């Protein structure tokens, strides 16, 4: 059994989701939102770092799966998002986790079946796949979807002997 931590990074709200990958599929472990408040950016990044580290220490995942930065219309927002991602990745690396990164369209494709799915479609499929009875918060459901994406990607690579391969530009490199 493998525990996967999915992170949907944000400078104000960072979603997290932990799933257990078993021979029968994935099971829900935990999810939630890290709310950083309205303080200066460096203080909010510290909250992301410490909170992600605490989630890791509480649940013991072996892998962090995180969404890649997309090109936002607002450059300032994209930079803050990138810094929040960095804080989460450093927390994971400090705790010895491997890190996997996925684009938003890869996550949507893996969970919903189409890269153009909206947040509500992702949320409903997360509920269905993990057999949840209540809707998780949007940021938490996105994080669970990122974790599910990693689990599905790993399952599809194992039969082909490509688990250790590196993904660059949409291609797998051995």
Swiss-Prot record:
It is an enzyme of class 3 (hydrolase). It is found in: Cytoplasm. Gene3D superfamilies: Ribonuclease H-like superfamily/Ribonuclease H. GO terms for cellular component: cytoplasm; Holliday junction resolvase complex. Its cofactor is Mg(2+). The active site is at residues 8, 67, 139. Binds 2 Mg(2+) ion per subunit. Pfam families: RuvC (PF02075). Mg(2+) 1 binds at residues 8, 139. Keywords: Cytoplasm, DNA damage, DNA recombination, DNA repair, DNA-binding, Endonuclease, Hydrolase, Magnesium, Metal-binding, Nuclease. The keyword Nucleotide-binding does not apply. The keyword Amino-acid biosynthesis does not apply. NCBIfam families: ruvC. Belongs to the RuvC family. Homodimer which binds Holliday junction (HJ) DNA. The HJ becomes 2-fold symmetrical on binding to RuvC with unstacked arms; it has a different conformation from HJ DNA in complex with RuvA. In the full resolvosome a probable DNA-RuvA(4)-RuvB(12)-RuvC(2) complex forms which resolves the HJ. This is Crossover junction endodeoxyribonuclease RuvC. The lineage of its organism: Bacteria, Pseudomonadati, Pseudomonadota, Gammaproteobacteria, Pseudomonadales.
């Amino acid at each position: 059994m493998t525990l996967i931590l999915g992170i949907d990074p944000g400078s104000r709200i960072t979603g997290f989701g932990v799933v257990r990958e078993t021979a029968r599929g994935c099971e829900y472990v935990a999810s939630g939102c890290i709310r950083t408040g309205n303080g200066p950016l460096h203080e909010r990044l510290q909250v992301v770092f410490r909170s992600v580290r605490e989630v890791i220490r509480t649940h013991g995942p072996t892998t962090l799966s995180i969404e890649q930065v997309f090109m936002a219309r607002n450059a300032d927002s994209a930079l803050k998002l990138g810094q929040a991602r960095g804080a989460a990745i450093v927390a994971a690396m400090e705790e010895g986790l491997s890190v996997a990164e996925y684009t938003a369209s890869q996550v949507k494709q893996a969970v919903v079946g189409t890269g153009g799915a909206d947040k509500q479609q992702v949320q409903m499929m997360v509920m269905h796949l993990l057999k949840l009875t209540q809707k998780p918060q949007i940021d938490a459901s996105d994080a669970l979807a990122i974790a599910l994406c990693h689990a599905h990607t790993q399952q599809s690579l194992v039969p082909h002997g490509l688990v250790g391969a590196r993904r660059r530009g949409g291609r797998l490199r051995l």
